[in-house]
Regions:
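Bacterial N-terminal signal peptides
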Residues: 28-39
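C-terminal beta-sandwich/jelly-roll accessory domains of carbohydrate-active enzymes
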Residues: 402-413, 422-423, 429-630
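N-terminal secretory signal peptides that target proteins for export/translocation
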Residues: 1-24
């Protein structure tokens, strides 16, 4: 038996509006909503555990091959085990035991209605196998059991490839005549690398692989002979054309594959303060062969926030906007913004502020929705919440549209993502500024009804946003979810994110900073009559542009709390400063934010604030101070 989306929504709305005793009597119906959404018509991704994905002819339902689009036919959900393991900035290897444990976690989450279509295996290969063999110490019998269990449970397996860069892999004999001068990468347009690489992709397709992730591409690689005779532009053009043609042929032969592009295919993802348009532009012809292009691994933006994880949200939001401005459709951008894990690559986040990160990933409108990391960190109750958000947005992505609005996140302007269908709209709105701001939630289409009677569905703790008509008032650094039309219903309430706390008020404090010694600024202020102090340090280079400090990644790097320091004293006595950025951060950081609690200083005596950078060459530091009340 199957249901339409509208039938499911009607059931949910009806059950949730019943009195409590009736809700209990109708609990089976509500459980079907939470756990049985995979039976909704037009969503045949989940089948009997022992059955593979059916074809259209077998079910009479939806099948990708029945559509005309050559790529990106429908939203999908991907699990990737990167950040559950980490061998680059940590020492946790990718073992068969770890991978199979996460597969069991996928099956656990499915019981609560969570959808996964693909399992992407990250760096799996033996360094001497030319992408044909798995690492023996960790995969003694190869991948067969993993592939078999995935497919038995209706999950399609995928593999990560370092493309033509020799990242933790040695050149196979067939690649030797494609190597560049430093023997770190292979040309796509010369020698035997590309033919052998494409044969390898086909080899894995024939073994059941259906998704391929291409990372670390070096499109400027050329043999020493070619480097002497051709320009960099000619070399790059030849590589792009050769690889794109090869992927086209591969897709034509295997039309059900999903191909995802990561590092190396365009865009500047190091920070949110870089120039735009991108210095490394995105070649839109890649959309002919890739289902998605990613917009950067999670990292802090150059927007200072007391909550470190919110600055990371802003980074992913900013990069999606920049890729959209580079003319990529939102559905083709993989924001890669949601990672769980206790590893260096995700800054030992575990599940901190995970709900806001997940909501934002869904709200950005990408059709390749990737979840990374330790799924066991999600409780059963978390899984129910996850499934509820997923069901809301997968319906809107599949049937409706997603659009951006407001300012550019990295420019510290309020912004958001809106999704609509003919029955209503939902808006995720973010205020990145150190001020209370109001932002309009515009109509997303001419056929959309005017926004009125909106409902606040989700928010951070602390400041209580106020929705008035088509506007919302947000606290500093706050995000919220608002529903209109059908979605302005208790059925879509998502609760409060308690591990992100927003001040109920914020006011600037008069503070004049002046140089004290090298890479140090100092100010003396009169303590405010009430509230805590928030101190913000921003680092710039001698050219006036935002500059990140890079004191090394884990495990041997220096903590950012030592690289960018905030110090407060009163009468010669040190005052504690609470910070959340004291982490070893592989991606660098350009700011520091800290707070001093009101009870730790005397009101009648001035405070001395010192902000410093450990950079060896001269930098420019900017300091700001605010009074905040929680």
């Amino acid at each position: 038996m199957s249901f339409t989306w509208n039938q499911v929504r009607d059931v949910v709305d009806t059950v949730l509006e019943l009195p409590a005793p009736s809700r209990h009597r109708h609990g089976v119906v509500f459980w079907l909503f939470l756990c049985g959404l995979t039976q909704v018509a037009a969503q045949p991704w989940q089948n009997s555990p022992s059955q593979p994905h059916p074809t259209s002819s077998e079910t009479g339902g939806w099948a990708a091959k029945g559509l005309g689009a050559p790529v990106a036919r429908d939203p999908i959900f991907v699990y990737n085990d990167w950040s559950a393991y980490d061998e680059l900035s940590d020492n946790i290897p990718l073992t068969e035991q770890l991978a199979m444990k996460e597969l069991d976690e996928i099956l656990r989450l499915r019981k609560f209605g969570v959808r996964f279509d693909y399992y992407m295996m990250d760096a799996w290969f033996d360094p001497d196998g030319g992408y044909r063999t798995w690492r023996k110490p960790y995969w003694p019998d190869g991948p067969d059991q993993w592939i078999k269990k995935c497919r038995e449970n209706g999950i399609l397996p995928g593999l990560w490839f370092g493309t033509n860069l020799l990242e933790k892999i040695n050149p196979a004999p067939q690649w030797q005549d494609s190597l560049n001068a430093n023997k770190g990468a292979m040309s796509f347009s010369e020698g035997g690398f590309l033919p052998h690489f494409m044969e390898t992709l086909q080899y894995w397709y024939d073994h059941g692989i259906r998704m391929y992730k291409f990372d670390f591409a070096d499109l400027d690689a050329a043999t020493p002979e070619t480097e002497k005779t051709k320009s960099k532009e000619q070399i790059r053009s030849a590589n792009v054309d050769a690889f794109r043609r090869a992927l086209k042929k591969f897709r034509e032969k295997n039309p059900d594959v999903v191909l995802a592009a990561f590092n190396g295919f365009g865009g500047d993802v190091e920070s949110t303060s870089g120039p735009f348009p991108f210095r490394n532009p995105v070649d839109l012809r890649w959309l002919e062969v890739f289902d998605s292009l990613y917009s950067g691994d999670p990292r802090a933006s150059d927007v200072p926030e007391m909550n470190f994880w919110r600055s990371m949200d802003i980074y992913s939001d900013h990069m999606v906007r920049r890729y959209e401005q580079s003319f990529l459709p939102l559905e083709r951008i993989d924001s890669t913004g949601f990672m769980l894990g206790n590893t260096g690559t995700i800054y030992y986040r575990k599940t901190s502020a995970w709900k806001g990160a997940f909501l934002l990933m869904m709200a950005r409108g990408g059709w390749v929705n990737t979840v990374h990391g330790n799924l066991e960190f999600l409780t059963d109750e978390d899984a129910r919440w996850f499934a509820k958000v997923q069901a809301l947005y997968l319906g809107l992505e599949s049937i409706g549209r997603t659009k951006t609005f407001g300012g550019i996140p990295g420019d510290v302007q309020p912004y958001g993502f809106g999704a609509l269908d003919m029955e209503g709209a939902v808006y995720v709105v973010v205020n990145p500024a150190q001020a209370v701001n109001e932002i309009q939630m515009p109509q997303l289409s001419q056929v959309q009804k005017a926004n009125s009677n909106g409902r606040l569905l989700f928010r951070d703790a602390g400041f209580e946003p106020k929705v008035t008509g088509d506007k919302i008032r947000l606290g500093p650094g706050q995000m919220a979810l608002v529903g209109y039309g059908r979605y302005a219903s208790p059925a879509y309430d998502m609760g409060v994110q308690t591990d992100v706390r927003i001040p109920r008020s914020i006011q600037p404090v008069d503070a004049t900073f002046s140089p004290a010694e090298k890479n140090t600024i100092q100010a003396m202020i009169v303590p405010p009559a009430r509230g805590d102090l928030r101190i913000i340090l921003q680092q710039k280079g001698s050219d006036g542009n935002i500059r990140r400090s890079w004191p090394g990644g884990p495990p041997s790097g220096i903590s950012m709390g030592k690289a960018l320091t905030l110090h407060v004293s009163q009468g010669g006595k040190d005052i504690p400063v609470e910070i959340a950025y004291d982490k070893i951060i592989w991606s660098g950081l350009s700011w520091g934010v800290g707070e001093v609690r009101r009870g730790s200083f005397n009101l009648g005596q001035p405070l001395t604030i010192r902000c410093a950078s450990a950079e060896k060459d001269s930098v420019a530091l900017v300091g700001r101070v605010y009074e905040v009340e929680y």
